[in-house]
Design a protein with these regions (language model features):
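Start-of-domain marker
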Residues: 1-58
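Mature, soluble, non-transmembrane domains
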Residues: 55-195
């Protein structure tokens, strides 16, 4: 994140630890009652998401990659203001979920306040409790990692699980996906910056 509120975003979905299992699953039609998408369907879905993101004002340099050898996918883009990333989330959410309403804001940054917020407005607890035990197993070994890099110096973070880099220019929050799904831990974080 640049001091003026512009920056770069990258989302990485790394399933490489499950590569052997995913190779087997990819040869099946269904698993645990869920249809298994083909590689072509997955590539098409990422291409659709890329197009949706690219249509968002203030967003540029949109790129998606899908690696079926290592099972790593990524989406990256450049934004003119942090609020443009909120628009990206709303646009993708609307395209994928129809009439369901996306949160208005998950990121907040005002250059004058020197405070960056990653809000935790998603709740998966009800959906998680409805999952089969086989589906719930996925969450036990999955992790969520958020790394934020800044031009300014990090002086404080609100989430006690956050680690700040020795340079004071980056933070990392790594949580078990099960703890997030059951709301034992939060991805919310207020990061205070200074010049």
């Amino acid at each position: 994140l640049n001091t003026d509120g512009s920056g770069n975003f990258q989302l990485v979905l790394n399933l490489s630890k499950s590569r052997t299992k995913l190779n087997s699953i990819s040869k099946m039609k269904t698993v645990n009652g869920h249809d298994v998408p083909s590689k072509e369907e997955i590539k098409s879905k990422f291409a659709d998401i890329e197009k949706t993101i690219a249509k968002t004002p203030g967003i540029s340099n949109v790129k998606t990659t899908v690696d079926f050898t290592n099972y790593i996918a990524s989406i990256s883009c450049t934004f003119t203001q942090v609020n443009r990333m909120n628009d990206v989330v709303k646009n993708v959410y609307a395209k994928e979920n129809g009439k369901a309403k996306a949160p208005e804001k998950i990121y907040d940054y005002t250059p004058a306040s020197k405070t960056f917020n990653r809000l935790n407005l998603f709740s998966f607890k009800n959906e998680y409790t409805k999952l089969s035990n086989a589906d719930k197993e996925i969450f036990a070994t999955a992790n969520y990692t958020a790394i934020f890099k800044f031009q300014s110096t990090v002086t404080a973070t609100s989430n006690k699980e956050t680690k700040t880099a020795p340079s004071k220019k980056a933070t990392m929050l790594k949580l078990n996906a099960l703890d997030i799904a059951t709301e034992k831990k939060s991805i919310g974080n207020k990061i205070t910056l200074t010049n």
